[in-house]
């Protein structure tokens, strides 16, 4: 875990990617459920 100089740790990439994916999916389904998804 000490060899992270010049590179981003994979767990950080995975965590950020997971949060972004969950957020986008949540917004998409919330918009569709609210009737706003059809305009996107």
Curated annotation (Swiss-Prot):
<keyword id="KW-0812">Transmembrane</keyword>
<dbReference type="GO" id="GO:0009535">
    <property type="term" value="C:chloroplast thylakoid membrane"/>
</dbReference>
<comment type="subunit">
    <text>PSII is composed of 1 copy each of membrane proteins PsbA, PsbB, PsbC, PsbD, PsbE, PsbF, PsbH, PsbI, PsbJ, PsbK, PsbL, PsbM, PsbT, PsbX, PsbY, PsbZ, Psb30/Ycf12, at least 3 peripheral proteins of the oxygen-evolving complex and a large number of cofactors. It forms dimeric complexes.</text>
</comment>
<keyword id="KW-0793">Thylakoid</keyword>
<keyword id="KW-0150">Chloroplast</keyword>
<keyword id="KW-0674">Reaction center</keyword>
<protein>
    <recommendedName>
        <fullName>Photosystem II reaction center protein J</fullName>
    </recommendedName>
</protein>
<keyword id="KW-0604">Photosystem II</keyword>
<dbReference type="GO" id="GO:0015979">
    <property type="term" value="P:photosynthesis"/>
</dbReference>
<keyword id="KW-1133">Transmembrane helix</keyword>
<feature type="transmembrane region" description="Helical">
    <location>
        <begin position="8"/>
        <end position="28"/>
    </location>
</feature>
<keyword id="KW-0602">Photosynthesis</keyword>
<comment type="function">
    <text>One of the components of the core complex of photosystem II (PSII). PSII is a light-driven water:plastoquinone oxidoreductase that uses light energy to abstract electrons from H(2)O, generating O(2) and a proton gradient subsequently used for ATP formation. It consists of a core antenna complex that captures photons, and an electron transfer chain that converts photonic excitation into a charge separation.</text>
</comment>
<dbReference type="InterPro" id="IPR002682">
    <property type="entry name" value="PSII_PsbJ"/>
</dbReference>
<keyword id="KW-0472">Membrane</keyword>
<dbReference type="InterPro" id="IPR037267">
    <property type="entry name" value="PSII_PsbJ_sf"/>
</dbReference>
<dbReference type="GO" id="GO:0009539">
    <property type="term" value="C:photosystem II reaction center"/>
</dbReference>
<comment type="similarity">
    <text>Belongs to the PsbJ family.</text>
</comment>
<keyword id="KW-0934">Plastid</keyword>
<dbReference type="Pfam" id="PF01788">
    <property type="entry name" value="PsbJ"/>
</dbReference>
């Amino acid at each position: 875990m000490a060899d992270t100089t010049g590179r981003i740790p994979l767990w950080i990439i995975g965590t950020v990617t997971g949060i972004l994916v969950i957020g986008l999916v949540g917004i998409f389904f919330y918009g569709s459920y609210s009737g706003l998804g059809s305009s996107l």
